[in-house]
């Protein structure tokens, strides 16, 4: 499909995996109009991140709140209601069926897109077995993707390696957000299952999450432009 620069900007989510708000603000300023979507995880959420979320939204940026919620249904539902009021665009929760259903009900009427986390991209088969799961990462991701669709979730988070197969499971309407994206010729970091930007989009990803290759670059803006160019390449 033909994708223009603008929609690629909407599809690139920069992970603000930095120690404090000051560094996050610096990065957002550096990246300027090139980036319209940011991911905020635990690290920033617990260091003044909620105010920062509001600042980003006021600056007309979209926020992907990566909280990977998992608790009793009622507790998750109340959290989702409050997060929806913030004006956040995406929120992650672990893809457990009853939790997802409760969250979907709580987010009704808001613009919040709920994403089910299938399997963490840092986990391989041995890790899953150690954690007490019998399934392979692929099998578990399939099961959870199916359950996310049945619960009425907005999308799923999965490794780009499973994206093509999972896209068939969830259909074309749901978001498929893939972390573990590394531009051509870069280091894997701590993710065991990684893929290049264009390849991930061609595999069915709707959004790419990129953190380390941008935030650790000598020039984050140049790195971002390179990734956007890789995303557009071959459209």
UniProtKB/Swiss-Prot annotation:
Listed EC numbers: 4.1.1.23
Active site (catalytic residues): 68 (proton donor)
GO cellular component term of the entry, any: cytosol
Pathway involvement of the protein, from the record: Pyrimidine metabolism; UMP biosynthesis via de novo pathway; UMP from orotate: step 2/2
InterPro entries attached to this UniProt entry: Aldolase_TIM, OMPdecase, OMPdecase_AS, OMPdecase_bac, OMPdeCOase_dom, RibuloseP-bd_barrel
Database matches in SMART domains: OMPdecase
GO molecular function, one term: orotidine-5'-phosphate decarboxylase activity
Enzyme class: lyase
NCBIfam families in the record: PRK00230.1 (NF001273), pyrF (TIGR01740)
Reactions mediated catalytically: orotidine 5'-phosphate + H(+) = UMP + CO2
Function: Catalyzes the decarboxylation of orotidine 5'-monophosphate (OMP) to uridine 5'-monophosphate (UMP).
Record-annotated membrane-spanning stretches: none
Organism: Bartonella bacilliformis
Residues where substrate binds: 17, 39, 66-75, 121, 182, 191, 212
HAMAP family: OMPdecase_type1_B
Pfam families assigned: OMPdecase (PF00215)
The keyword Transport belongs to this UniProt entry's keyword annotation: no
Domain of life of the source: Bacteria
GO biological process: 'de novo' pyrimidine nucleobase biosynthetic process; 'de novo' UMP biosynthetic process
The protein's assembly and partners: Homodimer.
Keyword annotations of the record: Decarboxylase, Lyase, Pyrimidine biosynthesis
Family to which this protein belongs: Belongs to the OMP decarboxylase family. Type 1 subfamily.
This protein's name: Orotidine 5'-phosphate decarboxylase
């Amino acid at each position: 499909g033909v994708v223009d620069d603008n929609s690629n900007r909407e599809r690139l989510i920069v992970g603000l995996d930095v120690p404090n708000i000051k560094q996050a603000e610096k990065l957002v300023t550096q990246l300027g109009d090139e980036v319209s979507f940011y991911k905020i995880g635990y690290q920033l959420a617990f260091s003044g991140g909620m105010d920062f979320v509001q600042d980003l939204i006021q600056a007309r940026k979209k926020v992907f709140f990566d909280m990977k919620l998992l608790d009793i249904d009622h507790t998750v539902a109340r959290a989702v209601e409050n997060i929806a009021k913030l004006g956040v665009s995406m929120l992650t929760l672990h893809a457990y069926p009853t939790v997802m259903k409760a969250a979907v009900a709580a987010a009704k009427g808001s613009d919040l897109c709920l994403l089910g986390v299938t399997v963490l991209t840092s986990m391989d088969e041995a890790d899953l077995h150690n954690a007490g799961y019998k399934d392979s990462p692929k099998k578990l991701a399939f099961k959870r993707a199916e359950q996310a669709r049945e619960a009425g979730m907005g999308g799923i988070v999965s490794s780009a390696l499973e994206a093509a197969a999972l896209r068939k499971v969830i259909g074309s309407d749901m978001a498929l957000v893939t972390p573990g994206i590394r531009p051509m010729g870069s280091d894997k970091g701590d993710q065991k299952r990684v893929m290049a930007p264009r390849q991930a989009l061609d595999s069915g990803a709707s959004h790419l999450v990129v953190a380390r290759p941008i935030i650790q670059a000598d020039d984050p803006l140049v790195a971002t432009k390179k990734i956007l160019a890789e995303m557009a390449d071959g459209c």
